[in-house]
Structure formats: structure tokens, C-alpha cells
Amino acid sequence: MRNLKNITILIVSLFLTTQLIAKDKVYKLKMATTWGPTLSPLIDAAQNMAKYANEMSNGRLQIKVDSANKHKSPFGILDMVKAGQYDMGHSASYYFKGKDINTLPFTSMPFGLTAPEQYAWFYEGGGLELMQKVYAKHNVLSFPGGSTGVQMGGWFRKEIKSLDDLQGLKMRIPGFAGEIMARVGVQVTNIAPGELYTALDRNSIDALEWVGPSMDIKMGFHKIAPFYYTGWHEPASEMNFMVNKRVFNKLPKDLQKILTISMRVAAYDMYIQNYDMNATAWQKMKSEYPNIKVTTLPSDVMKALKKANSELRVELGAQSPLLKEVLDSQDNYIKRVREWTKMSDFLYLKDNI
């Protein structure tokens, strides 16, 4: 009887010791990003997420963030996370459309959802579930990773006065907007962020789209291409966090929750950080860079872009039932939420500007 009691005590002690060890175990993950080490606020979102995860887990979840300068593959983030070369990634979903066209809509679609509308779609309208459905084939989980809000339409060497001025123009513009521009006659290319200024300076391109005043001014595009156009193509550009599914499933449940909360908080932090940065840069741009000519695309160009957008969406939907499901979900959500956007934000601004 005494031996049985001793054995029981030993088993319980071993169990408790194992639980304590498991609780105190440190999990170290590596994350690759598309961004350079100074590309705020994009790189900030990744670094802040890692910081939050470390702090909330009391050091049990440590994430090392590698910028594009480290791994040299800014557009290869999905492949590296899928293969297990990195445990996590931070990029933009539409960069992977060449690998999987279904990833396209999760960044932003031309003439689509605004940032508040898109966040509501992700978390209340089924968008996050559709994102997981698309990334499941890659054995990767994907989450919203920070929004730039409305992006500016780009920097051009010459003024665009009509649709004819776009014919043969060489422009860096990614995502679905690139497909639309190609349809109306633009020679479209995609270039990594760190190479944009050089491409413009060396006449490899005639125009480029980047983000907004804060990030654009720091890149110096205005020194070469003074015509700065307002946006139409990315009303709510959302970055994305990716996690290798096998890695995620090996984390204890509490660390899984801490990780998902860290990503969500870092994403929203980037949105408000970028909004403030753009507002500050816009004031600086108006006072310190009078050579910049801010304007909008002519009505005939906008009409052609909207027509191309409608045609291409139908064509893409016919190619992939899953892509059509995502696009239909966004369209249906716009129909429901846009009425409130008009009644709230639009009318408030209309009456107070």
C-alpha cells in the first residue's frame, strides 16, 4: 500500500513538473518581411507584433524579424513560410497573385472597400474565413497585417491629359490595378520597394505607384516625377501576416491566442500610425515642395479604368470559383455597408469641410 502511495506521489510530481516545464518553455520563431529595415510603418507593424507577443507571453513567445535586406527575397515570403524556411511572414497578399490568383483580393481592390469597411468585412463579414480558405492549400494561416488606407494614384513624369497619354507608358503598379492599367495600354511591371527610386531615376519606368505622402516623400520620387495623382486603385491596402500552420498548431493554446491578438493589435496600430504620418507629410509637402503638382486623372481615363475593372472581374471570376466567391463576398458586403458609410462618414465630411 505504501509503495502504491509512493508511486502515485511520484506520478503526480512528474506530471506537475512536466506542466511547469511546458508552461515555461520558450518558443522562438523567425519572420521574414517584404520590407527594408527603415520602411516605416510597414516594418513597424512586424516589429511591434513581435514586441507585443513577447510582452504578453512574458518572454515565452519570441519572434525574430528579418527585413528583406536579410533574406533577399521580398516577393518570396509566402513560399518561404510555406516551405518552413521561415515560421512567419509579413507582406501584402496581392504580391502572390502570380503563384495563386485567389490571394489577390485580400490586399485591396480598385473602387472597393474603404479601410473601416474592409476591417468590418474581415472580422464581421466572413472575410477572414475566406482568407483562411484560400491560404489553406499552402498550409499557411493568414491574418490582416496593417492598412495604409487610401493610397495615392502615383507619380508621373508627365501630366496625363487623356487616355492616349497612357499608351505605352511604363509604370510600376502591382495587384489588380496593374491588370487594369495593362488593359488600357500601360506597360505594367512590379518592382521591389528598395529598387523603386533607381528604376525611376534610370528611366526604366515612366511612373510608379507606392503608398502615400509620408512614405513617398521619403523615397524622393517627387524629384523626378512631379505629377502626383489621387487614388482610385487601392482604397484600403491591407498587409498580411502569415504563419506556417504546422508551427502554429505546435504552440500552446494560450500562445496561439497571444499571437493572433498581437497581429490584430499591430495591424490596427499600423493603420493609425500611417494615417497620422500621412497627415503630417501632407502639410509638409504643401509648404516645402511647391513643385509637386497634385491632380486627379481625367474623366475619360477614369471611365476607361472602371470599364476595364468590371470586365476583368468577370473574367477572373470565370477562371476561379474560389476567387469569384471572395469577390462576390466583398461586393455583397459593400452593398450592405456602403449605405451606412454614406449616412455617417460621407455626410459628416460633406457638411464639415
Give each language-model segment a name:
Residues 1-28, 347-353:
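Short, low-complexity disordered leader/linker segments with a strong preference
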Residues 23-118, 128-353:
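N-terminal secretory/targeting leader peptides
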